[in-house]
């Protein structure tokens, strides 16, 4: 039966009763290039694509719109069939296809089941079936995803096959619809959205499509974030850009106007703005004058001062030279004795050697040393040592306990001896002591 222009056979109504029964699939067939109809497999090996019954109503097609079904998984009655008008016009002449070889795009997902009456449940797969591989004679090796070609307009399918196939495979199509929703994950992520762009859809009509089934990402994923060699080669441009050595370029050419130093931890200035090194600047700040360049000669040690002798005992060696009331130099012993007793030190107290004491340790260090010594001796005299326990037990032996091993030191005036009896045969003694 011929179809009028108002009811095209390639577009089915979205609310068709057959579609409400779940007879749809989760894939969209927008095939860009077709082969010669003479190379088609026999009709009994192909699935019934589109059928029209005797009443002129449309039978649900083999393909449905995957743009609406794959990403969101709607109910079965939301699907609709879409076919490009240019593809429909290509079958009117019946002489040649739009493109030369079979071009695969992102929508060319094969169906794994060879026929509707196939026993094993199938779905969308990333590997082409044997029937699809045999059809794609001019197919290039990287593009593995193809559809069976759509029959031309003048070819009318067998009504007996269509009616029997539509009635017997309704439940089978429902099962495959559910299975294909979960098997289409690869196509959903990698191949589904490429043909949404008009440039991708038109590229297959003009010639061979250049898209691969593997997802290609934009340039800003690799150009901006991952530069070649930034991670693998360990380029220092990303990781060691801030690790620059500190240069002292601002201090080059400076010189202290007092001592002539060229390197100092801190440069200072005098009242006139000239640079001073840290030492000269501090000296000028504290004393109000320039730091002397020549160090003063150190005085000889008092014990080795030549030509000096004690005015009292006539010794020439001492740790500290002092002066008496008359201004004469005296040794440390004679001067200290006179300071304390107001009389000269007797010569009988003179000694050949100098008695000295170790004054290097200050009083604070002595206290800390005593504290550390006490801490070191603490484990030795701890109350948990056996000797300390024995002494503690001997000191508590005069307290009348019913158990000699009890170690509670409770004052006896507060608790009478009768109340301190903790024997198991006197349970009321604890109540008496607490009461």
Curated annotation (Swiss-Prot):
Residues 1-42, 138-177, 350-386, 407-435 are annotated as: Disordered. A zinc finger (GATA-type) spans 256-280, 310-334. InterPro entries: TF_GATA-2/3, Transcription_factor_GATA, Znf_GATA, Znf_NHR/GATA. CDD domains: ZnF_GATA (cd00202). SUPFAM superfamilies: Glucocorticoid receptor-like (DNA-binding domain) (SSF57716). Expressed in the embryonic nervous system and in adult reticulocytes. GO terms for molecular function: DNA-binding transcription factor activity, RNA polymerase II-specific; RNA polymerase II cis-regulatory region sequence-specific DNA binding; zinc ion binding. One of its GO terms (biological process) is embryonic organ development. Pfam families: GATA. Residues 157-169, 407-421 have a biased composition (Low complexity). Keywords: Activator, DNA-binding, Metal-binding, Nucleus, Repeat, Transcription, Transcription regulation, Zinc, Zinc-finger. The keyword Cell membrane does not apply. Residues 357-370 have a biased composition (Basic residues). The keyword Transmembrane does not apply. It is found in: Nucleus. GO terms for cellular component: nucleus. This is GATA-binding factor 3. It comes from Xenopus laevis. The lineage of its organism: Eukaryota, Metazoa, Chordata, Craniata, Vertebrata.
């Amino acid at each position: 039966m011929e179809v009028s222009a108002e009811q095209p056979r390639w577009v089915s109504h979205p609310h068709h009763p057959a579609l409400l029964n779940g007879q749809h699939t989760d894939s969209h067939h927008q095939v860009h290039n077709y082969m010669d109809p003479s190379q088609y497999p026999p009709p009994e090996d192909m699935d019934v694509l589109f059928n029209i019954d005797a009443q002129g109503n449309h039978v649900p097609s083999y393909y449905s719109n995957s743009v609406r079904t794959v990403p969101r998984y709607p109910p079965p009655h939301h699907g609709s069939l879409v076919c490009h008008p240019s593809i429909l016009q290509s079958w009117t002449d019946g002489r040649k296809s739009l493109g030369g070889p079979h071009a695969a795009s992102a929508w060319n997902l094969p169906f794994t089941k060879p026929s509707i009456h196939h026993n094993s449940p199938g779905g969308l797969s990333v590997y082409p079936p044997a029937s699809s591989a045999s059809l794609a004679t001019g197919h290039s090796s990287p593009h593995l995803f193809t559809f069976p070609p759509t029959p031309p307009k003048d070819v009318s399918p067998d009504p007996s096959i269509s009616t029997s196939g539509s009635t017997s495979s309704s439940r089978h199509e429902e099962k495959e619809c559910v299975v294909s929703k979960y098997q289409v994950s690869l196509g959903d992520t990698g191949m589904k959205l490429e043909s949404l762009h008009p440039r991708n859809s038109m590229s297959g009509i003009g010639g061979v499509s250049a898209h691969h089934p593997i997802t290609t990402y934009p340039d800003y994923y690799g150009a901006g974030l991952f530069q070649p060699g930034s991670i693998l080669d360990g380029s220092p441009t990303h990781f060691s850009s801030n690790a620059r050595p500190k240069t002292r370029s601002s201090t080059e050419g400076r010189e202290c106007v007092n001592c002539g130093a060229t390197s100092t931890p801190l440069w200072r200035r005098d009242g006139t703005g000239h640079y001073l090194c840290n030492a000269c600047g501090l000296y000028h700040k504290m004393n109000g004058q320039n730091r002397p360049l020549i160090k003063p000669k150190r005085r000889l040690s008092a014990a080795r001062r030549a030509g000096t002798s004690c005015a009292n005992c006539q010794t020439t060696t001492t740790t500290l030279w002092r002066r008496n009331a008359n201004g004469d130099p005296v040794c440390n012993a004679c001067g200290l004795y006179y300071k304390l007793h107001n009389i000269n030190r007797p010569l009988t107290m003179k000694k050949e050697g100098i008695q000295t004491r170790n004054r290097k340790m200050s009083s604070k260090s002595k206290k800390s040393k005593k504290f550390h010594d006490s801490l070191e001796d603490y484990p030795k005299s701890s109350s948990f040592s056996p000797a300390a326990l024995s002494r503690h037990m001997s000191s508590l032996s005069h307290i009348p306990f019913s158990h000699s091993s009890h170690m509670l030191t409770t004052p006896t005036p507060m608790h009478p001896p009768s109340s301190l009896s903790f024997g198991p045969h006197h349970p009321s003694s604890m109540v008496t002591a607490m009461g």
